[in-house]
A protein has these predicted regions:
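Flexible, glycine-rich loop/tail regions that form catalytic "lids" or insertion modules at the edges
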Residues: 66-67, 130-171
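Core mixed alpha/beta domains of very large multi-subunit molecular machines
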Residues: 1-128
Length: 171
């Protein structure tokens, strides 16, 4: 595990890397080119490494104002090119997001307890229905419904449908 962390420190700001370490005495240090070798040599059990988000990490996603439970939910990271958050259209309803410049926030739980709590209580898959009136919070939107309908027509062969899906990024 320490060797894996040393590799992250070596990569530093290059993804996937790490930007900070926290020493056992609680002091936080930024990893710089000048300090990188010193930090790698000093790294022992007890140090914490603040690494970049990686595929599978749990994060909390919300949009202000957080008026109800669905305004803050846990999602799992899938790292893609670019420096933006991306949200599946089926998960937009509880956030009242409509892709017109909505400001969203992402938070990374810092302890094992917080990560477990996020997975158990806040996971999108466990919050499909509104606790207020038992209606769906997550579901297909207009474009997905229309697209599924069009795919169900006999106008496309299976091969053509697969090519369309593949070119749209679904493999």
């Amino acid at each position: 595990n320490i060797n894996k962390l040393k590799k992250l420190i070596e990569r530093n700001e290059e993804y996937p890397g790490a930007n900070y370490i926290i020493r056992p005495d609680g002091k936080r240090k930024k990893i710089t080119l000048e300090l990188k070798e010193e930090i790698i040599n000093a790294l022992v059990s007890g140090y914490k490494v603040e690494r970049h988000l990686q595929n599978g990490d749990v994060v909390l996603f919300n949009r202000h104002p957080s008026l109800h439970r669905g305004s803050l939910m846990a999602h799992f990271v899938r790292v893609l090119p670019g420096r933006t958050f991306r949200l599946h259209p089926a998960a937009t309803f509880p956030y009242n997001a409509d892709f017109d410049g909505d400001e969203m926030n992402i938070h990374s739980p810092q302890t094992e307890e917080a990560r477990a709590e996020a997975k158990i209580l806040l996971d999108v898959k466990k919050n499909l229905f509104s606790p207020k009136n038992n209606t769906n919070l997550i579901g297909c939107k207009a474009d997905a419904i229309t697209g599924n309908y069009l795919f169900s027509l006999d106008e496309f062969t299976g091969e053509e449908a697969n090519q369309i899906l593949f070119k749209s990024g679904i493999d």
